Amino acid sequence: QQSIDLGVDGLTLHPRPDLRHAKPSDISMFDEICLKANKEFNIEGNLFSPSSKDYPGFISLVNDHNPHQVTLVPDADGQITSDHGWKIEQLDSIFKSEVSKFKKNINYVSIFIDDDFSNFDKLNEIGINSVEIYTGPFAEVIKDGKKHEIHSAQNKISKIVESAKLNNLKVNAGHDLNLDNLPYLKECGNIDEVSIGHAIIVDSLKYGFKDTINMYIEQIKE
């Protein structure tokens, strides 16, 4: 709620089957907060995550709530964190069918992609209308600080942003983004949305939560 009050544009939750990031009850709470504030609520997860004792399955979680956006990631159930995007051969007829169902009630159905993805025509065929670029490798390059590698990494992101836009896709980016690498990412073209996660917690220990949120908002929107 404090994030919304301070001016963030939306909230994202990644409810994994092991519940280590979020519980189903958290989704209901976030859903209500975003709905009241007219802010975007994004639910992230693997389309094929099945139900268990305490986890109703990803599809059920989405259908039981009111997200503005769903971001589909190829994470295995026990995977520590998202570390790669979808491969084109994974986007089969079952995937397409579920995307079609989601789009009846959800503004954006997005998929997690690597920075060398190229099959954007396939995404249009499936019905995907948004992508999230996995920026883990990009963040590592910026952290290393080698100018020629930074330039190369920015070119990769710029090309994928341009290709996605040519295919009328909303472009998001996320993973390991922070105050140090966001300025470099902003030079890579018209990215519509970024997701900031762990870095907010880390920076809050130094600057406090309110100042941290304000710093990110200023960095992103300046």
Q: What do these predicted regions represent?
A:
Residues 9-32, 74-87, 135-148, 204:
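Glycine-rich, proline-tolerant flexible connector loops at the mouths of alpha/beta enzymes
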Residues 110-156, 160-163:
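Histidine/lysine/aspartate-rich catalytic loop segments that bind and position anionic ligands
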Residues 50-64, 116-127, 173, 177-191:
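Catalytic cores of alpha/beta
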Residues 31-35, 95-106, 124, 158-166, ...:
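Surface-exposed amphipathic alpha-helices with a cationic face
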Residues 31-91:
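Glycine/small-residue-rich loop that forms an oxyanion/phosphate-binding "nest" at active or ligand-binding sites
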Residues 70-126:
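Hydrophobic, well-structured mid-protein blocks that either form specific transmembrane helices
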